[in-house]
Structures are given as structure tokens and as C-alpha cells.
A protein has these predicted regions:
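Predominantly a Rossmann-like dinucleotide-binding segment in NAD(P)-dependent oxidoreductases
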Residues: 10, 121-124, 131-235
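Glycine-rich phosphate/pyrophosphate-binding beta-alpha loops
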Residues: 255-265
Length: 411
């Protein structure tokens, strides 16, 4: 397969960003089809091909019609959250790889349907979780695999981002606003959980066992709505949701979701092992025997030690992941190059007809956190079991084929 022929289902703003990243890959892939139920969005999408001086794709109003197009090898699905899984299932049943955008699941039932579709067809799907290909996330993965962190004990991650403007966008039926209006849980889990899961070898020798979630009161979105004169709305989504996940190998992951209060953006990543720690919010790493440690005396002459962070960037020269060694001087696409790396990984899987580096079991496990956290919160924070979507295969998975795009090992 010389060129991957891609169909894009869902032609909103995210599709426009992804198209820009695809165009920047120059020749590796061609968009041969597009689909949206809105003719206006189709028309705008086609106008972008005039801008890029590219041949216009065939367009459809129904995704099932696009999936019958023999000139499409695989599909990218940047649609509304609740339609990702159904479209992915439909694509796999037609023999086409599917790359879905990020989001959480509405139920575990739909996740099992997705897993069964992949297993029965031999065609997989992938989540385009770009943060798995972030430079620091991959560097820490590389350092962990080389043993610098020792045995992993505890991790943190999350999504904290001031998106309070969603409080006054419900009238426009903005989908993300509606989820926050009606639901209460860990609604956007994968930006932090994806990289942390790969570092912890989830679904390959480890798995999520149980979770508990706790939610605060909800004020931020309501205040944002009132600032625009909207008085008759109350958002269910808590200002802060905290979720603790217990893993089979004994690690604990703490997740924090907060998108309605004033704050800078963070994915809150922390990786703590017996020999070191990475803390995203400090922009630092501490590795025993490498990072600064000073023995001092207090005013009474008693000895004590202080420890200092080493800047993340100080480790790039020795521990930059091979992917970033190859691409750091040639960043293309959105989110600092992460978008294009995730896309390249997907296109490589399509070309080689191999399992993507983020496979259907990963997608199911990560997305399940949303609906399971809702259940835990509704029951006052009671523990909820996380399904084993691998049906036991996590204990001794068949080794993956070595690939530069792997997120499990470093090749």
C-alpha cells in the first residue's frame, strides 16, 4: 500500500485541524472521502481543498455510505463523543481501520461491542490520543523502561483546563457543554490516563482493577452562565472530580478532572517510583543519584537533606525517545507535533495491517473510566470494578511486533 486512502467522518473544527496535519505529511496519505450530516460543513470542508490545492474528496451525508466506498482504506472519526464507538464498530465490520478522537464512554456495553467487533473482524481501531506522543511523556516512558525510576508505585494524571465558557454555550447545543450539563464524572480521561497507562503496561501485564470517584459541588459553569445573563441553568458536572484507580500490580493512579474554574492548563502528570519521580507541574524530574541532593545542618546542628528538581529538558540529550530524536526538528501538525505523530502511528498500522499502538483494549479501558466514575459518584464514592476487556489476555499477551511507534516498549 503506497498511500493510505482516508475517509473523515465528522467535518467540524477538529476535522479541519486534522486535515492540516494530514496535508503536512505530504504524500503519505490522501483524503479520498468525507462525511457529515450537515451539507454546510461538507461545503466548508471541500473549500479547504481549494486552499491546499488538492483534489477534492467524494462526500457523503451518511457514514455507512462512506464505509462502502472501496477507495477508502481507513477512517478518522472526529465526531461527537457518543457516536465514536458505533462508527468505529461499523467501520471494522466493513474491514476498515478506524481512528477515533478522544472522549469517554456512555456505557461499558458499547465498549464490549467495540471489542467484539475488533476480535471478530481482525481489524482494529485506535484512539488518536496525541498526548501519548508528547515529548515529555515519551521521554519518561523511555526512562522508566531503562529502570531509572525503579519499581513504579504511584501515578497521577488529569485534565485541568479553564473551559468555563461552556457554561453559556448550551443554547448553541455545543456537545461538550451538554455532557457537562447533564453528567457528573471523569468526562475527559484520556489525555493524562493514556500516557500513564502505557507507562504502567496496562493490558500488557497489568490492568485496572477498581476505581472510586468523588465529586465536589458545581459552581463554575453556573457562574459563567450568570455572567452572560443566563439564570435558569445548573450544571451537574462537579468543579473537581477525583478518581482513584487501583491496578493489578499494586500501583494507584489518582486522576483529577476540572474544567470550570480559573486556572492554567495542566494534565497533572506524576510518575513516582522507588528511585525517582517526574512531576509535570514542576517541569522537573528527580532521579536518585543523578539529581541534586544536599546534606545540610539546621540551626541546632542537626543533619538533614534537601532535594532539587532537575529540569525535564536536561534529560532530553540522553533520554529523548527515538521518535522525538527523529522528529523534534521537523514538527508538523497540531499540538506541537503530537497530532501528526499519532496520525503517523495510525497510518503505519493501516499500511502494515498490524495492531495499532493504542489498540481496542486500550481504547475500551480508558474510555470506561468515564461511565464507571459516574456510577461511583452516584453511589457516594463506592468502589466500582473495571471490566477486563482483554478477557484475561493481559496476563500474558502475545508480544507486539517491534515498531518505532510502539508505546509499550522502546525500539
Amino acid at each position: 500500500m503506497k498511500q493510505v486512502k482516508i475517509g473523515i467522518i465528522g467535518l467540524g473544527g477538529r476535522a479541519e485541524t486534522l486535515l492540516a496535519s494530514i496535508v503536512a505529511l505530504s504524500g503519505e496519505v490522501v483524503v479520498t472521502a468525507g462525511c457529515d450530516y450537515s451539507q454546510a460543513k461538507i461545503d466548508h470542508f471541500l473549500s479547504l481543498f481549494d486552499k491546499y490545492k488538492l483534489k477534492k474528496p467524494k462526500t457523503y451525508l451518511r457514514h455507512l455510505d462512506l464505509l462502502d466506498d472501496k477507495n477508502v482504506d481507513a477512517v478518522i472519526v472526529p465526531t461527537s463523543w457518543n457516536s465514536h464507538i458505533q462508527i468505529a464498530c461499523d467501520a471494522m465490520k466493513k474491514g476498515k481501520y478506524a481512528a477515533i478522537e478522544v472522549g469517554g464512554a456512555a456505557s461499558c456495553d458499547e465498549l464490549w461491542q467495540m471489542v467484539h467487533a475488533a476480535e471478530s473482524t481482525g481489524v482494529s481501531c485506535m484512539m488518536l490520543e496525541n498526548c501519548c506522543y508528547g515529548r515529555n511523556e515519551l521521554m519518561v516512558l523511555n526512562m522508566v523502561r531503562q529502570g531509572l525510576f525503579g519499581e513504579l508505585i504511584y501515578c497521577e494524571c488529569g485534565y485541568e483546563h479553564d473551559l468555563s465558557e461552556m457554561g453559556y454555550r448550551t443554547d448553541s447545543r455545543q456537545e461538550r457543554s451538554l455532557h457537562n450539563l447533564h453528567r457528573n464524572g471523569e468526562l475527559y480521561p484520556t489525555h493524562g490516563l493514556g500516557p500513564i497507562s502505557k507507562i504502567l503496561k496496562i493490558n500488557r501485564g497489568n490492568r485496572f482493577l477498581t476505581l472510586t470517584s468523588t465529586a465536589t459541588k458545581s459552581r463554575g459553569f453556573d457562574l459563567a452562565a450568570r455572567s452572560r445573563g443566563i439564570e435558569n441553568v445548573h450544571f451537574n458536572e462537579a468543579d473537581i472530580v477525583v478518581t482513584n484507580i487501583k491496578c493489578a500490580n499494586g500501583e494507584v493512579i489518582t486522576m483529577t478532572h476540572g474544567v470550570s474554574l480559573p486556572r492554567p492548563y495542566s494534565r497533572d502528570c506524576r510518575v513516582q517510583g522507588t528511585k525517582g519521580i517526574w512531576l509535570e507541574n514542576s517541569k522537573g524530574v528527580y532521579i536518585e543519584g543523578i539529581s541534586p541532593r544536599y546534606d545540610k545542618l539546621d540551626v541546632a546542628g542537626n543533619p538533614y537533606s534537601t532535594h532539587e528538581w532537575t529540569p525535564e529538558s536536561d534529560f532530553y540529550e540522553r533520554f529523548d525517545h527515538p521518535i522525538w530524536q527523529a522528529y523534534r526538528n521537523h514538527e508538523v501538525g497540531g499540538h506541537g507535533g503530537m497530532d501528526s505523530l499519532a496520525l503517523r502511528a495510525f497510518f503505519d498500522a493501516v499500511k502494515t495491517r498490524s495492531t495499532p499502538p493504542i489498540d481496542v483494549y486500550d481504547v475500551a479501558a480508558w474510555m470506561s473510566i468515564t461511565c464507571l466514575s459516574e456510577q461511583s459518584i452516584a453511589m457516594g464514592g463506592l468502589p466500582v470494578p473495571v471490566p477486563d476487556f482483554t478477557n484475561g489476555k493481559w496476563v500474558c499477551r502475545e508480544p507486539e511486533k517491534p515498531s518505532r511507534w510502539s508505546l509499550n516498549e522502546v525500539y
